[in-house]
A protein has these predicted regions:
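Hydrophobic transmembrane alpha-helices and their immediate loop junctions
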Residues: 1-252
Length: 252
């Protein structure tokens, strides 16, 4: 199982370019340390995914981070998604404690480990901090509102981050990271209708058994981890009935 998932690791072409540049600029040791930390971090996500028997599509190693892509439903229970998101940072902390215990920590490792840990917890999509933030907001309000609260929070945070880069700590690597994050944000905004329809279609096609139920006015108010009764005038109908009308009309 482990070997099978290790074969899903894909190296981004830019990774090789950064490896070459770091070797000719005397920063190859730092690049290796950075990459090891990224690998450990992603293995945290992978481990959590395997515990929940979620299929891993691919593990992408970038020159400035990693990305584990799972084949999991949008309607996965929030606690499972939370554990998957938090296991990356947790593995980093455990790895640091292990190295500290055997007296193998140095200033380079401490610097990069702290940077990756704190940066990754920023509420910027698609970082873990954004996923954790989105899970918290999903506990409070609907899926649709949560998505846009997370999106606009990401924009505000990335603007503040750009300010820090420009006026406090100009760094080419950070600028490349910002461009990657902006690209992902734009993609997330463009894909919202697809994601929302997938959220609804999953609920129509599958029988999710949620212990909590609430009455809502329309599908825009649907929440994760809840089943719903929709009030239409003086009549109450199940979410399945509403979704059947929506998707049956589309297929005709």
């Amino acid at each position: 199982m482990i070997i099978k998932n290790l074969l899903k690791i894909k190296i981004h072409p830019l990774f090789y370019l950064f490896a070459f540049l770091s070797s000719i600029t005397g920063l190859f040791y730092e690049f290796v340390i950075f990459t090891i930390i990224i690998f450990v971090h992603e293995m945290g996500h992978v481990t959590a995914g395997l515990l929940f028997k979620i299929n891993i599509k691919k593990i992408l190693i970038l020159p400035f981070g990693g990305l584990t892509i799972f084949e999991m439903p949008i309607n996965i229970r929030l606690y499972k998604e939370f554990l998957i998101a938090v296991m990356g940072p947790l593995f980093q902390i455990i790895f640091w404690l292990f190295l500290y215990k055997i007296n193998y920590c140095n200033s380079v490792f401490n610097y990069y480990n702290t940077f990756i840990l704190l940066f990754n917890l920023l509420p910027i999509y698609p970082l873990d901090g954004s996923k954790i933030f989105n899970i918290v907001i999903n506990k409070i309000t609907s899926f649709k509102k949560s998505y846009f609260v997370t999106f606009y929070t990401s924009i505000i945070t990335i603007i503040l981050f750009i300010y820090v880069i420009i006026f406090k700590n100009y760094n080419l690597s950070l600028i490349i990271i910002v461009f990657f994050l902006i690209k992902e944000l734009i993609k997330g905004y463009i894909n919202f209708n697809f994601i929302f329809n997938k959220f609804l279609l999953e609920r129509y096609k599958n029988d999710f058994h949620f212990s909590k139920r609430r009455v809502i006015k329309n599908i825009n108010s649907m929440k994760r981890d809840y089943s719903h009764i929709i009030k239409e005038g003086n009549k109450y109908v199940t979410e399945k009935e509403i979704l059947r009308k929506r998707f049956d009309n589309v297929s005709k």
